[in-house]
Amino acid sequence: MNKTTVGWREWASLPELGIKAIKMKVDTGARTSALHAFEVASFQRDGREWIRFSIHPFQDSDQSRECEAPVLDRRVVTDSGGHREERPVIKTLLALGGRRWPVEITLTDRDTMKFRMLLGRTAMDQLVVHPQASFLLGGNEHQP
């Protein structure tokens, strides 16, 4: 299979969540992908645990989007500062560079972080990362 070459930061979309554009850091040091989420609340639907959450897809913007997804799992994740946190895990489609594939994403508060989303190693099987490049698939620092 041909792999798509990406830079260390790219614009992507999460179509099942209604997120048309989100700037993400392609982080080979992170095992699991992470998405900024706030106002997180669990609820039951058809006998399954679901989660409702809001996100700010764009840094330094009050624009928010409310999303819902079934909870796939709950995992304890250790962040880069060594802090351990139990996070809900969802599975959703990632669209990047003309490809779409399902990825597992943990939800956490990334409000103080530079990127609203991290793409971890387990979601990179279709990618090759060029660590010195950015936005190889289009866009720039400020827009997709």
Label every PLM stretch briefly.
Residues M1-P144:
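Pepsin/retropepsin-fold aspartyl endopeptidases
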